[in-house]
Amino acid sequence: RALASFTQYLDPALVLAYHTQGQLIYWNFDDIEVSGALALGREFARLSGYSLENTPYASGFAGYKDWFIKAFRRPGFTIEAGLGENPLPLEQFDTIYANNLGILTTAALGLPE
């Protein structure tokens, strides 16, 4: 509830939900295709080198990104950073940071109106 309330207060243009398995990006939820989300997801994939994937049905319905897309009808992304078993080794930090810096910068600069 706290995260939902905080998100409603901030009213963000998009959200990034970070997880740590797979070096991929999930961009959609339950047949809801938000305007501009696919193009932005493709840009995030290009910047990070991660693959862009549809959210698997079995993985949907429980995440922050899924709730955000449904509630706000705005772009939301789950970024699966890193490889291996959790907890990921600290040695992956520099690579994960380098792979995600472009995503973070692009998201922070905002969406074109």
Predicted regions located by residue number:
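Metallocarboxypeptidase
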Residues: 1-113
